[in-house]
Amino acid sequence: MFRFTEIEKTLCMDRTRDCAVRFHVYLQSLDLGSSDPHSPDFDGLAYLRDECLTKHPSLGDSNSDARRKELAYAKLMDSDQRCKIQNSNGYDYSHIESGV
């Protein structure tokens, strides 16, 4: 992962291409049952919409888009640096038993 393309940066940081956001918007448009697991008209997709996807950083009261992009870029750079170190030093297999 020495280099990554502009497309990869865009996919990582562009909110309009964020799959979770698009999926959440799609689920919001559906007429679903109750998200309460104890309700007789419980719907798993409603639960997913109300409980899981609302925890997405761009859907709640979390980081701004600018801060989110900054954090995503920092995470990419950190990952890239770790890959460079592993590629230059090789992988450490000392924890694996040789007889296996």
Curated annotation (Swiss-Prot):
GO terms for biological process: viral RNA genome replication. Its EC number is 2.7.7.48. It catalyses: RNA(n) + a ribonucleoside 5'-triphosphate = RNA(n+1) + diphosphate. The keyword Transferase applies. GO terms for molecular function: RNA-directed RNA polymerase activity. It is an enzyme of class 2 (transferase). The keyword Nucleotidyltransferase applies. Transmembrane segments: none annotated. Keywords: Nucleotidyltransferase, RNA-directed RNA polymerase, Transferase, Viral RNA replication. The polymerase complex is composed of four chains, the three other proteins of the complex (alpha, gamma, and delta chains) are supplied by the host cell. This is RNA-directed RNA polymerase beta chain.
